[in-house]
Structures are given as C-alpha cells and as structure tokens.
A protein has these predicted regions:
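Loop-helix junctions at membrane interfaces
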Residues: 1-213
Length: 213
C-alpha cells in the first residue's frame, strides 16, 4: 500500500512531494515499529520512487509531449519475455535449481513469472488502447512502471549489500536477496494498477477545483 500512495502523490502533485511523503511517513513507521535498521533503505527507495515517477509523469503535462508508447511497449515486452523464460525454466528444470559451487538452491517462485506476465500483459493492453488514453495518462503509466522498476532493483541491491556486510559470499547473497523479489513484484504490480486507476478521476477533480478557484 505504501508504494501505491507514493506513486499517487507523485502523479497528483510532484515527485518531490511524493518522495518526501513516502520517505518520511514510511521511514517513521519503520523507526517506531522496531525496524530502525531499515530506515535508511526506506528513505532512499521511497524518495527515489517518488522522484522518478514525478519526473517521468511531468513530461506528459508538456503540450508538445509525444506519446511514450514505444517505451511502454518495450517495458511490456521485457516483462513478458522474463515471465516466459522463467516459466519454461521452472517447468523444464524445476522450481529449485542447483547451482554448482553454491550450497543454496536457486528458487524460481511461480509468483515471479505469473506477476511478470500479468504486468507485461497489462502494459500491452495500455499500448492497445493508447489512442483512447491521453498523453498525460500514458506518461503516468510509464512513470509508475519506472518507479517500481527502481524499487525492485533497489530492494535487490540493498539486500545483497546487507548480506555482504554480515559476511555472506557474493553469489549466496545474490540468491538470498532474490528470494524477496516475488513479494516486491506483487506489491509493485498492485501499486501501479491502483495508483494509475485512482489518478485518472482524482486528477480531473483537482483540475476542476483549480478552475473554480
């Protein structure tokens, strides 16, 4: 839920506002609930999500902005390709793959390819009906995807770094950090769809209020 509100705030207002609201609010939550060690990661990632979403979405408000459908199509293709590769890898080799020289097995959680395919197909639908969507909404979708992509990479890298600090080997750290990605991907997919769905009516409401003022 937290990422969804960060994205929504960044879309409705600015990336700075969205990033600050997310980093401060979720950072304080971690601090007050016994997760003090996670505060730096939370602050950096949530601000990054807001900043990236706001930066990308702001381009859609430019009168001369061109449709970003090419980039949405690329994102859709990448996600679908990842989902297909993971699916066939899991079905042919199994969900648990033994990597030579590493004790821990590489686990391909079905959630990874299922939600990768769902998100990819969702973006494909956006591309299909792009002509019915304004340039602003198209950039909002692209911004939300970019923000969640940043969060996925950030969560993974922070996880690897944290494990390396406590003495883990490099490859085991990578595998262990990858285990948390399914939950992050589910949260991210939910955040993108809900934030954009709420943004459409709320942005119109805010625009009408500005006109009335």
């Amino acid at each position: 839920m937290g990422n969804m509100f960060v994205i929504l705030a960044a879309l409705l207002f600015t990336g700075t506002i969205g990033g600050l609201s997310g980093s401060i609010g979720m950072g304080l939550f971690d601090l007050m609930n016994g997760y003090a060690s996670s505060v730096p990661k939370t602050v950096i990632l949530k601000f990054g999500i807001g900043a990236i979403v706001g930066c990308v979405a702001a381009r859609g408000k430019n009168k001369n902005a061109k449709s970003p459908i090419k980039w949405i199509s690329i994102a859709s293709g990448i996600l679908i390709l990842i989902g297909i590769v993971l699916f066939f890898t899991a079905t042919s080799l199994g969900n648990e793959i033994v990597v030579s020289g590493i004790e821990k097995k590489l686990v391909i959680n079905p959630v990874l390819y299922i939600f990768s395919l769902i998100l990819g197909l969702g973006l494909a639908l956006v591309c299909t009906f792009a002509k019915k969507l304004s340039i602003e909404i198209q950039y909002a979708v692209l911004g939300a995807v970019a923000g969640i992509a940043f969060n996925l990479v950030g969560e993974f890298l922070f996880g690897v770094f944290k494990l390396l600090l406590v003495g883990s080997g490099f490859l085991p750290a990578i595998l262990s950090s990858a285990v948390s990605l399914p939950a992050t991907l589910i949260n991210g997919s939910f955040s993108i769809f809900v934030a954009v769905a709420l943004y459409v009516p709320l942005s119109k409401s805010l625009s009408n209020k500005k006109v009335n003022l």
